[in-house]
Curated annotation (Swiss-Prot):
Residues 211-246 form the UVR domain. GO terms for cellular component: cytoplasm; excinuclease repair complex. Pfam families: GIY-YIG, HHH_2, UvrC_RNaseH, UvrC_RNaseH_dom. One of its GO terms (molecular function) is excinuclease ABC activity. This is UvrABC system protein C. It is found in: Cytoplasm. CDD domains: GIY-YIG_UvrC_Cho (cd10434). SMART domains: GIYc, HhH1. Interacts with UvrB in an incision complex. InterPro entries: DisA/LigA_HHH, GIY-YIG_endonuc, GIY-YIG_endonuc_sf, GIY-YIG_UvrC_Cho, Hlx-hairpin-Hlx_DNA-bd_motif, RuvA_2-like, UVR_dom, UVR_dom_sf. HAMAP family: UvrC. Residues 22-101 form the GIY-YIG domain.
């Protein structure tokens, strides 16, 4: 049975609040579907939990939204506040509750990921954590993307590492192995254990343990030299020189350079804060990490503490420095220090420097945080101006948060595809992009129909919503209820505006499709014609009067161009696949199954063409006679 929110069940709420113990511990807030919304900790559970429901208590919009959904609260009592902190950290890490995401770093700054769960792990740059891959290890988030890419490129030149997600060939190594960039993991030319040992050395660079790595490599170089393995010794020497080059431009030195320190400072404006972490190891700046935070209902000390809890709960204990310099005194300075010391198994000091060089570095980190804050605010303000202007152009009731744009791509009807791109708050949200293969039997080579294609795509896109409405659902009421109901019904993708790449004809076909779905009164739909950049709205013959350089039009063009790029990329990919298959279809005796086997094994027509008879005949499921036919087709002059 689904529980109703506590805030609407005064009797149950009153009974629950009376029985809360005033001990240290954690509280887990859940919605009516038993989904975890929020995990919190407190020295006194009763006082903290009651504060959420106390009348007259001003909560931030984010927390107010959460409280309206809370239907059950689970309590876990601990012996002390330190245990509560550790438990909270573990619960957040395990469950990733929606309302615990105070820090907004996922899409702004990249991480370095090492896939330790693989037999031969990869190392790559990413902006998104893979939730299901628990053995993945992440380093970051790094502020300087250019420097991170450069560092990763240099590391892959210094150490032979796996270069590809999918092997280029199934039965042989590629060029990367020949030039020493890869140890031949696809053919298991190196054992998994030896490869992981190499990667552990690379990991030490991102952990800031370059001094340890240098000592390790120097010992190995001497060992190789004494064993007269001069080529191996030279390779290790080159790695040592390369590591030195990675940091040779780093001149920032702080007192007691033998000590490892992280310096953390922040800058705030309105409801957003930028937090920067400078990682100093052996007197050198080896990393600059960044977070953004919603600071409504939080002061500077709370935000800094939240950053520290979040960041250090996700790193290896060896990466925790012996000293952390912070801009403001933390809410629970001693508690956090003891917690980190317990994880590291070594004393960790958290200090607020007031004078000397350390205080100057805090100011420098604060300055960098402020620069990053202004950069983000400037981008946000620009997007807001564009969205506001677009709202005025189209006479919309509200600023469109989610905008979708659709485009069709084909060549005279062949390989017809469509794209759906999504902008949220004026920014491309690539995780929501979709591609469609046009399925209508009327669309074929020599016969194109953009109107029918667009109608098909829109019908497929909004079919779920039409079914919901047909079953008696109220779309407007559903959208106004910002609860977990949308996610539960898999109806969390309603756009505030739909943009069609095309003119009046394409717009009319889309409106007709929406009328058939009975959604024409719910959706805002427009079209943008390429030739004169004209904007059309339903049931109006003339285009809207606009200026080409006004902010709203710039946003529409950027959206349309992105939809076109995404559609044409998919079209080229599909056409390339068809052309590969069509060439192989000309070879006598090759059916669809064998064509599929060939392409899976060799990856390209060029590779099949270059393959020897031995390579062809050893392809699983092919056989010698078929290999002869393929070889003769591509090399008729060598036919004996």
């Amino acid at each position: 049975m689904e529980l109703i929110p506590l805030i609407r069940d005064k009797s149950r709420l009153s009974d629950f609040l009376k029985d809360i113990p005033n001990d240290p511990g954690c509280y887990l807030m859940k919605d009516g579907e038993d989904r975890l919304l929020y995990v919190g900790k407190s020295k006194k559970l009763r006082n903290r939990v009651r504060s959420y429901f106390r009348s007259g208590n001003e909560l931030s919009p984010r927390i107010s939204l959460m409280v309206r959904q809370v239907a059950d609260i689970e309590l876990i009592v601990t012996d002390n506040e330190s245990e509560a902190l550790t438990l909270e950290s573990n619960l957040i890490k395990s469950h990733q509750p929606y309302f615990n995401v105070l820090l907004k770093d996922d899409k702004k700054y990249p991480y370095v990921c090492i896939t330790w769960g693989d037999k031969y792990p990869r190392i790559f740059l990413t902006r998104k954590r893979r939730q299901r891959q628990l053995k993945d290890k992440y380093y970051g988030p790094y502020v300087d993307v250019y420097l991170l890419r450069k560092t990763l490129f240099s590391i892959k030149k210094l150490f032979p590492l796996r270069q590809r997600r999918i092997p280029l060939y199934k039965d042989r190594t590629c060029l990367n192995y020949s030039i020493g960039r890869c140890p031949g993991v696809c053919q298991e030319e190196i054992s998994s254990e030896d490869y992981k040992n190499t990667l552990k050395r690379v990991e030490m660079i991102f952990q800031g343990r370059t001094d340890e790595l240098r000592i390790l490599l120097e010992k190995q170089m001497i060992s190789f030299s004494e064993s007269l393995k001069f080529e191996e010794a030279g390779s290790v020497r080159d790695q040592l020189k390369g590591i030195d080059r990675l940091y040779e431009s780093q001149k920032m030195i702080i007192p007691d350079s033998s000590v490892c320190r992280d310096i953390i400072a922040m800058a705030s404006e309105e409801n957003i804060s930028s937090v920067q972490i400078f990682q100093m190891r052996s007197g050198k700046l080896i990393g600059r990490l960044g977070y953004f935070s919603d600071n409504s209902n939080f002061n500077s000390s709370q935000i800094l503490q939240q950053v520290i809890e979040n960041h250090y709960s996700n790193v290896d204990p060896v990466e925790i420095p012996s000293e952390i310099l912070v801009q403001h005194q933390l809410v629970n300075n001693i508690l956090i220090s003891d917690w980190l010391s317990e994880i590291k198994k070594q004393k960790v000091n958290i200090n607020v420097p007031k004078r000397s060089r350390k205080a100057e570095i805090i100011k420098l980190v604060e300055k960098n945080a402020n620069l990053e804050l202004q950069r983000i605010k400037q981008s946000h303000d620009k997007n807001l101006v564009e969205l506001d202007d677009l709202t005025n152009i189209l006479d919309l009731e509200n600023i469109p948060k989610r905008i979708e744009c659709y485009d069709i791509s084909h060549i005279q009807g062949s390989d017809a595809v469509a794209s759906q791109v999504v902008f949220i708050d004026g920014i491309a949200a690539r995780q929501h992009y979709r591609r469609y293969k046009i399925k209508s039997p009327n669309i074929k080579i020599g016969h194109s129909d953009d109107f029918e294609s667009m109608a098909e795509v829109i019908t497929r896109r909004f079919r779920r919503w039409a079914r919901f409405k047909e079953e008696g659902g109220d779309i407007n009421a559903l959208l106004s209820n910002q609860s977990s109901v949308l996610d539960n019904l898999n109806l969390n993708d309603w756009p505030d505006l739909v943009v069609i790449d095309g003119g009046k004809g394409q717009l009319s076909s889309v409106v007709a499709a929406l009328e058939e779905l009975k959604l024409d009164q719910n959706l805002n739909v427009i079209s943008l014609a390429k030739k004169k950049e004209e904007v059309f709205i339903p049931n109006v013959k003339q285009s809207l009067v606009t200026e080409s350089n006004q902010p709203g039009m710039l946003l529409l063009r950027r959206l349309r161009d992105e939809a076109h790029r995404f559609a044409i990329t998919f079209h080229r990919q599909k056409r390339s696949q068809r052309m590969k298959r069509s060439q192989l279809n000309e070879i006598p005796g090759l059916g669809p199954q064998r064509i599929k086997l060939l392409l899976e094994h060799f990856r390209s027509i060029e590779a099949i063409q270059m393959a020897t008879f031995s390579e062809l005949s050893s392809t699983p499921g092919l056989g010698r006679s078929t290999a002869v036919v393929i070889r003769n087709y591509f090399h008729p002059d060598k036919n004996k």
